[in-house]
Amino acid sequence: MSNSDYLPDYPLNSDLVKRLKSALDAKDEERVRDLICTEITPVDAVIELANDDWMKDPSAQLPTGMLLGDLDHLKPLMDQFFQDANVVFEINKDEMEWQVKSPATFGLSGLWTLEYKRELTTPLCIAAAHGHTACVRHLLGRGADPDASPGGRGALHEACLGGHTACVRLLLQHRADPDLLSAEGLAPLHLCRTAASLGCAQALLEHGASVQRVGGTGRDTPLHVAAQRGLDEHARLYLGRGAHVDARNGRGETALSAACGAARRPDEHGRCLRLCALLLRRGAEADARDEDERSPLHKACGHASHSLARLLLRHGADAGALDYGGASPLGRVLQTASCALQASPQRTVQALLNHGSPTVWPDAFPKVLKTCASVPAVIEVLFNSYPQLCLSESWKEVIPEEVFQMHKPFYQSLFALALTPRCLQHLCRCALRRLFGKRCFDLIPLLPLPKPLQNYLLLEPQGVLH
């Protein structure tokens, strides 16, 4: 049953809902508990917290004649809001709502929807969402249905979203369905999305939740959700309960691929690295391709994550793999280098080249120079992977003047090599690297050479070229 089929016991304009919304907005937990436990009847009452149906209470007073093709109504609106008959409409997800042109909408105008959008809930869902354990116990004791979900999500879903383990356990003890699907096709395990929800996931599994259940339009398993969110402890729990480490979602991704593709804040990188190491130890395929033929290494390089790239390369990832678009991992990191300065993208380039990645076709080097000009360390590492590269003075034109001045010593040393053979030391480096091939990273540190010379062989950037 969709939420449009429910008749709320407490509609949006009722006095109780107004007081409840006021308490929720003010974060007055005591008042919320009091309203839920003492004033709302019956125990499974349907409460309407929002109603955006424009036909009932439109934010823009659109005349009904417009829907009927009434030209007399259409012309004034066209004259007032847009003159271009081919106006582009801004659509948010699957809905269109009327918007007047304004700087906030960047000049785009939206339209309207006939969809009946409401936010319906129950006292139990509200209590579970806010972690009011005593209130949940009280409502269940009065016979509240633990699986009621008039708004599309049940109390278990709400408790898991909030990471309220005690509420989850109470609901499960009262026979809540641990695999209840929301209107979006998500089970409670799919909503264990934060570190605080680990106890919720544990309780769900103890009560028979399926660790392999796919959900939502993405057809993700709980392990995919944990991987996308960088939740290493959740992943450990799911794997211990029999989750398939290389299960595919609707985009053809494994959990490892999903983990490598998710954007991370700097403080999340360590946790993501632990998660990926765990998946690889449990047998995850390091080179698994998704529907676009992208490997986990492609995705790690797309974020210039050198520590993650090195981890994958140590587990056998192919440094020269090509996706459907013909892009290699090296190509991916070069595309993102100028936007990921804090990630030290030269480290990722260095790791790929030391594990056998083909370098860039010489004729394409000016394009790389243009793209990565603001990251001279990337240019240095890549340039040193060629025994000899014919430079042209015309290449200076692709470097913005302010960038050239900011990194003047490096670019002066680069163009000083135009029409000049590289030094013997560099040519010896290239000969050794060609001999070791994709094992440079493993074999060069074994050579009886001083550390600075080993670093030189491994293309460690020095700031200038010789």
From Swiss-Prot:
The UniProt keywords, alphabetically, are: ANK repeat, Repeat, Ubl conjugation pathway
| GO cellular component labels | cytosol
Extract the Pfam families matched here.
Ank (PF00023), Ank_2 (PF12796), SOCS_box (PF07525)
Q: Where are the ANK repeats?
A: 119-148, 151-180, 184-213, 218-247, 251-288, 292-321
User: For this chain's UniProt record, which GO biological process terms are given?
Assistant: intracellular signal transduction; protein ubiquitination
Domain named SOCS box: residues: 405-463
Question: Record's superkingdom?
Answer: Eukaryota
Pathway participation:
Protein modification; protein ubiquitination
Q: Known InterPro entries for this protein?
A: Ankyrin_rpt, Ankyrin_rpt-contain_sf, SOCS_box, SOCS_box-like_dom_sf
Per the entry's comment, what about the domains? The SOCS box domain mediates the interaction with the Elongin BC complex, an adapter module in different E3 ubiquitin-protein ligase complexes.
Q: Which family does it belong to?
A: Belongs to the ankyrin SOCS box (ASB) family.
What does it do?
May be a substrate-recognition component of a SCF-like ECS (Elongin-Cullin-SOCS-box protein) E3 ubiquitin-protein ligase complex which mediates the ubiquitination and subsequent proteasomal degradation of target proteins.
Q: Would you tell me the protein name for this molecule?
A: Ankyrin repeat and SOCS box protein 18
Name the species this protein comes from: Homo sapiens
Q: List the lineage, top down.
A: Eukaryota, Metazoa, Chordata, Craniata, Vertebrata
